[in-house]
Amino acid sequence: MPTLPRGLRFGSNGEVLNDFEALWFPERHTVDLSNGTCKLTGYITNLPGYSDIFPNKGVTAARTPYRSTVPVNHLGYRPVTTVEYIPDGTYVRLDGHVKFEGDLVNGSVDLTNFVISLAAQGGFDYQSVIGPRFSARFSAFSTKYGVLLGEGRETLKYLLLVVRRMREGYRAVRRGDLKRLRNVISTFEPSTIKGKRARAEFSQTYRDKLTGNKVEVRPSEGKWNSSSASDLWLEFRYGLMPLFYDIQSVMEDFMRVHKKIAKIQRFSAGHGKLETVSSRFYPDVHFSLEVTAVLQRRHRWGVIYQDTGSFATFNNGRLVPVKDWKTAAFALLNPAEVAWEVTPYSFVVDWFVNVGDMLEQMGQLYRHVDVVDGFDRKDIKLKSVSVRVLTNDVAHVASFQLRQAKLLHSYYSRVHTVAFPQISPQLDTEIRSVKHVIDSIALLTQRVKR
């Protein structure tokens, strides 16, 4: 048996146990650091040899000791430790040239090592965006069998509808009958009980007189409606595509049964978002700078795990092994998610509030995996900086030539965890997909028709 690095040991069954509790949750201590001095040199009206030097605002940061671990060679992973560096603001160093011309004051000044402090960097969390990817990864089955059964009747009707349309479309193309081809996508809407009976005797997808059926329908019993572009789009998005996905997921479930399980596996998912912060600063009495910075906030969650080959349910970020068939059957069907999925327009609500994601995470059946290590990592990067020069005088020219912008004391947090990201209620009003825009227009068109 190989020798393990300090902090690791073998358990009774030969498994590797991690004794890094002291490094998982180390104490943070506060440090005060200097950002040096800022230097201004150049020309300002009545001050030809202008020069000024002043200290920049210092930074206070909470940090943990920087520790690292030795990789476990025969297992292929490095145990995770907690490392954090959390400054009390967003400190950006600016080097550039300020130029302004006004009625009263003109100036041309070089700015060196001017450190500004914007809003604090921390305070963001994207677990609710990352969580659904974990739910999909560790789900016992790719197919939502409860939803499939709940929508089975409608799915079967739609499948038969597609088959009939394909058959009649083929016949129309072969005969060169464009009118009949157009009527392939027409639907009959009955208004009486007799009309419903008549609809059962012929296809709902094309006109009775064009198919050879002898069933006659009176206008009082119902009417034929031609499908619009919005009808066809919604039918494609929420009828045909889900049907294809269900077929694909059933095939994936079949292939997963024969998939070889590796001893140690990794999985991580992340999300990033751009945030804009701005503020005004006064390096000199003659002018001020309005600085706008675009920061990229990144959040990644990862786990190292072993697949046990059994099933589990989700409880507060952890997977709990299933001990009886009733619990497994309930999680497999997930009645709460089924009830939500069959609710009309529930998919529209999911665009703005993640109800479906929460019900899926809390109620579905999972593969039981033993998480041996993991991390919750957040960091911030500087994407861009823009600077605008402001003066008290009516300036004809006011410009800032940026030579360098650098993020100092950037936020970083990597916390050890063996849990999964927890999905919480989130209101999302951002437009994330062009498809959602088209869906919205199609739905509004449906409402106007009614």
Curated annotation (Swiss-Prot):
The yes or no answer to whether the keyword RNA-binding is present is yes
**Organism name:** Enterobacteria phage SP (Bacteriophage SP)
Region ranges (RNA-binding):
156-174, 255-265, 321-325
**Gene Ontology BP, a term:** virion attachment to host cell pilus
Lineage, top-rank taxon, reads Viruses
The protein in question is named: Maturation protein A2
Give the encoding gene's name.
A
Against InterPro entries, the record matches this protein to: A_protein
User: Which controlled-vocabulary keywords does the entry list?
Assistant: Cytolysis, Host cell lysis by virus, Host-virus interaction, RNA-binding, Viral attachment to host adhesion receptor, Viral attachment to host cell, Viral attachment to host cell pilus, Viral release from host cell, Virion, Virus entry into host cell
